[in-house]
Amino acid sequence: MKVSKKSYYGLRAILALAQTDKPLSIHALAETEHLPEDYLEKILQSLRKANLVESKKGVSGGYSLARPAHLINIWEIQKVLDGPIKVSTPLIKGELPCFQPSHCQTSEVWRTLETEIEKSLSHITLASLIPKNIPHHS
């Protein structure tokens, strides 16, 4: 299991937005976080479509959180950018799920792990990742 670059960059970007009360342009965000601007723009568009961030046009425009930082969790971000984290191997085309007894026994282990990952990430909010001495978009 590996978190994608898209999710990694997306979390960094949205966390940066959570630490300011003013909208940030894509350029400013890319520069601050050392992220590729074109790629960041695609990530932010996905987050905007999911109502995790909002954009404002104009001179004082840019991106900001659509909700308070304590109401956005890491699982939401992961699902939007990459879908649910899967640790199990997809079945080979045409293979029955329980073709052999070992398939049934091991598949439950992976499903349980996936459920636990989802639960854990659902309990981690953006606000909980911000150092206490930094004001954040609450």
What are these regions (language model features)?
Residues 3-35, 54:
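N-terminal helix-turn-helix DNA-binding core of bacterial DNA-binding proteins
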Residues 38:
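Key DNA-contact positions within bacterial/archaeal DNA-binding proteins
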Residues 43-48:
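Basic amphipathic alpha-helical segments that dock to polyanions
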Residues 49-52, 80:
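Residue cluster at the C-terminal edge of the helix-turn-helix DNA-binding motif
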Residues 69-94, 111-115:
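Conserved segment of winged-helix/HTH DNA-binding domains
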Residues 92-138:
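C-terminal regulatory/oligomerization modules of transcriptional regulators
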